[in-house]
Amino acid sequence: MEVSNSCSSFSSSSVDSTKPSPSESSVNLSLSLTFPSTSPQREARQDWPPIKSRLRDTLKGRRLLRRGDDTSLFVKVYMEGVPIGRKLDLCVFSGYESLLENLSHMFDTSIICGNRDRKHHVLTYEDKDGDWMMVGDIPWDMFLETVRRLKITRPERY
């Protein structure tokens, strides 16, 4: 069995080297491949954990509504003996009295600040330095600047 290699030869004399052929002039294509890293739109939409777009848009709308008043100071409130804490916005209260009234209703107990009466729970707070102090020792405005979390302690501790 014979295998023949036949190639047609192309002579350079048949092509004029000074004039580019129409096929040569149209070959000047630039190939540019770009792989987009992450578009700004996509970066803004990356959530973890992933949530549905309708829920994301709803939450986004609520954030925009809250930005108008920008007055919220959420702190966590714990009560000794109660396994679940609560989150509370301190900016809705006018002072210590309204805070104590709300906490007494929320935890269904009587709470005091400042005085040490053995019949009532005592409200303490952690300041920005990590120290625990009695609520009511400083003015309300200063309290709002320093409070990090609240704890309702048992009466027997004091």
Curated annotation (Swiss-Prot):
This protein's UniProt keywords: Auxin signaling pathway, Nucleus, Repressor, Transcription, Transcription regulation
PB1 domain: residues covered: 72-157
Compartment(s) where it occurs, according to its Swiss-Prot or TrEMBL record: Nucleus
Gene3D superfamilies xrefs: Phosphatidylinositol 3-kinase Catalytic Subunit, Chain A, domain 1
Motif EAR-like (transcriptional repression) per UniProt: ranges: 29-33
Disordered, as annotated region: 1-49
Ribosomal protein keyword on record: no
Induction: By auxin.
Biased composition (Low complexity): 1-40
GO biological-process terms attached to the record: auxin-activated signaling pathway; gravitropism; response to auxin; root development; shoot system development
Top-level division of the source organism's lineage: Eukaryota
One GO term describing the cellular component: nucleus
GO molecular function: DNA-binding transcription factor activity; identical protein binding; transcription cis-regulatory region binding
Keyword Nucleus tagged: yes
Family as reported in the entry's similarity comment: Belongs to the Aux/IAA family.
Summary of the function given for this chain in its UniProt record: Aux/IAA proteins are short-lived transcriptional factors that function as repressors of early auxin response genes at low auxin concentrations. Repression is thought to result from the interaction with auxin response factors (ARFs), proteins that bind to the auxin-responsive promoter element (AuxRE). Formation of heterodimers with ARF proteins may alter their ability to modulate early auxin response genes expression.
Assembly: Homodimers and heterodimers.
UniProt remark on domains: The N-terminal half of the protein contains two conserved domains I and II. Domain I includes a slightly degenerated ERF-associated amphiphilic repression (EAR) motif which seems to be involved in the activity of transcriptional repression. Domain II is required for the correct degradation of the protein through the SCF-mediated ubiquitin-proteasome pathway. Interactions between Aux/IAA proteins and auxin response factors (ARFs) occur through their C-terminal dimerization domains III and IV.
PANTHER family in alphabetical order: AUXIN-RESPONSIVE PROTEIN IAA17 (PTHR31734), AUXIN-RESPONSIVE PROTEIN IAA31 (PTHR31734:SF216)
Full protein name: Auxin-responsive protein IAA31
Organism encoding this protein: Arabidopsis thaliana
